[in-house]
């Protein structure tokens, strides 16, 4: 497996991003290893809040949320998925599979020995994170889902997703910062857009971002469909606290919150919130609001 590593210089002087990098190695399934970057903020002896990003962002997306969570006394773990952020980037599209992404994040949980986790997941962070919850129920204490889903391919994903999937494959240059900009309702500065572009010096670094839309199960016989169906069976028995924090202006995942509230027992009685003035990347549009809701959710649902 050929692996690319973004130079550290690309991450210098990013706006509102003053966090120390941490790294661990995960098996790449081909007799070598990938370096995974993660943030580890707040007291090490506190129960962890795990923040999982999605396509095509990285943990920079959580820069507004982390200070609020740590100020409330929480430890925050925010990894970059392989192919994104400061994590290594396999150079071939075929290096990326749904199962490998799950395995890579499973390795992060295992190596850091995370328990009593509160998960916040958005976009692909949910496709991966909800699998982790279903497969490691004893590690997780609470779940907060925002603008995400866990598709099995048994239901149509909608016109919004199909348009995004087609766009991601046909555009000659995949402009990551522009994609983030188009998924927000607030105006992003050029410096913030550049920060989202920072992990990708050129198109060769973007194979993971290009491949992600094709890995979403969209047919019943998708390679990930069976495992996702199994995950839903487990989630249908999940009685620990589960809250939905979706935004009001995301055409891709709209309605996913109602599905979760219908199926997952742990959603009963929770203060589910539709966050106003938030696009798909609600952490960018309303990060402070999301973080405060997450702090309240943890407070209202002690172990």
UniProtKB/Swiss-Prot annotation:
Top EC group: hydrolase
UniProt-listed Enzyme Commission number(s): 3.8.1.5
A Pfam family reported for this protein in Swiss-Prot or TrEMBL: Abhydrolase_1
Record: active site: 123 (nucleophile), 250 (proton donor), 280 (proton acceptor)
Top-level taxon of the source organism: Bacteria
Molecular functions (GO terms): epoxide hydrolase activity; haloalkane dehalogenase activity
Database matches in InterPro entries: AB_hydrolase_1, AB_hydrolase_fold, Epox_hydrolase-like, Haloalkane_dehalogenase, Haloalkane_dehalogenase_1
Keywords tagged on the record: Hydrolase
Segments forming domain AB hydrolase-1: 48-192
Catalytic reaction list: 1-haloalkane + H2O = a halide anion + a primary alcohol + H(+)
Similarity comment text for this entry: Belongs to the haloalkane dehalogenase family. Type 1 subfamily.
Role according to the record: Catalyzes hydrolytic cleavage of carbon-halogen bonds in halogenated aliphatic compounds, leading to the formation of the corresponding primary alcohols, halide ions and protons.
Quaternary structure and interacting proteins, as annotated: Monomer.
HAMAP family given in the database record: Haloalk_dehal_type1
Name of the molecule in the record: Haloalkane dehalogenase
